[in-house]
């Protein structure tokens, strides 16, 4: 419908696929990404018109803008993490421990997270609902005081020097 009205020349199937891949159809995220592409990305230096904005690159720019903004959805997500420490621990273990947690609808924290669409039941396994939430949660957890003071963060810059030489990854060492 948008393409019919605006004639941006976008590949509708590709853009729709990207939007769904990143949002799993979460209405606020779909709407916000489209609005950002249309109003913020289009007309910028890198994307001078709607045709340039409604591309994969334009979509990725909109995603970057979305992930860096404060909005009611992300504030709600962070609020639920603070209100439900057990949910916070579960999401952390999924993201950083690779744990597969059993979906339990009787767990109040899980129940509230499902109700808000932050997580989902994927064949009996608790999963983060979409890539946008996953990335936002990664960003959040990586900037907590605990993460910043962990051995990984303290020693990572020194370890990087071992593996990256002259700006290139040394595959033999990896």
Regions found by a protein language model. Give the residues of each.
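Winged-helix-like regulatory helical subdomains adjacent to P-loop NTPase cores
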Residues: 1-116, 122
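Residue-level marker of positions within ordered structural domains that often coincide
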Residues: 4, 118, 138, 142
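Short, amphipathic alpha-helical interaction segments positioned at domain boundaries
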Residues: 71, 133-170
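Secondary-structure transition/turn motif
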Residues: 114, 131-132
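Minor-groove-contacting beta-hairpin "wing" of winged helix-turn-helix DNA-binding domains
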Residues: 125-130
């Amino acid at each position: 419908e948008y393409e019919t009205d605006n004639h941006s020349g976008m590949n509708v199937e590709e853009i729709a696929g990207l939007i769904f891949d990143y949002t799993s159809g979460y209405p606020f995220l779909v709407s916000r990404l489209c609005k950002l592409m249309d109003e913020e990305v289009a007309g910028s230096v890198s994307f001078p018109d709607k045709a340039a904005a409604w591309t994969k690159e334009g979509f990725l720019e909109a995603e970057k803008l979305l992930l860096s903004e404060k909005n009611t959805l992300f504030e709600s997500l962070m609020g639920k993490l603070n209100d439900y420490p057990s949910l916070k621990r579960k999401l952390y273990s999924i993201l950083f421990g690779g744990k597969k947690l059993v979906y339990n609808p009787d767990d109040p924290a899980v129940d509230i997270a499902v109700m808000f669409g932050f997580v989902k039941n994927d064949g009996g396994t608790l999963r983060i609902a979409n890539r946008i939430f996953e990335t936002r949660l990664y960003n959040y957890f990586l900037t907590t005081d605990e993460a910043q003071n962990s051995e990984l963060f303290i020693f990572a810059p020194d370890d990087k020097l071992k593996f990256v030489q002259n700006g290139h990854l040394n595959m033999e060492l990896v």
